[in-house]
């Protein structure tokens, strides 16, 4: 009986040690990752683009920058909440820098358009970079200068203080690779098919390629 009790205690202790190691590893990993928030028009598109980037761990669609708490997609689309459609990007700074991510971002949008993006019009589709500190602000300002110098046009993408980020509902997460069948203006399609049809019809890639040429990232054909 004593031997069995000792063995059980040893097993429990071993499991506890493993759990502690796993927890410490998880905390250390979380401490090594960083997040950033950008608004680039349709959040499905921005999420889709950045989840392809090496060093990006995840991209989450949501809303930020407004005055309405816990906004819904329908509320934000009215333009009365002050919120932007935005994406929160979690990344590993050892694999990709904040500066590189911002450069990819600015070259994946039309920063000269202050009224929305591509076929999506209205305040919720405006573009912005949300910064958390002086370093991020300086890098964002340098990115805007780069865009202005490259495009030789006035840049309408805003640099704003980071605000609370509200995660959009499940139907809006990973829409670009969803398998659920939905009714759209293109008929009944799988979400992934509806996304591709929408992106093409909206002219996002054509406009970005026209602006940025060979430097344009994320172009799909």
Predicted regions and their residues:
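Flexible coil/turn and secondary-structure edge motifs
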Residues: 2, 27-221
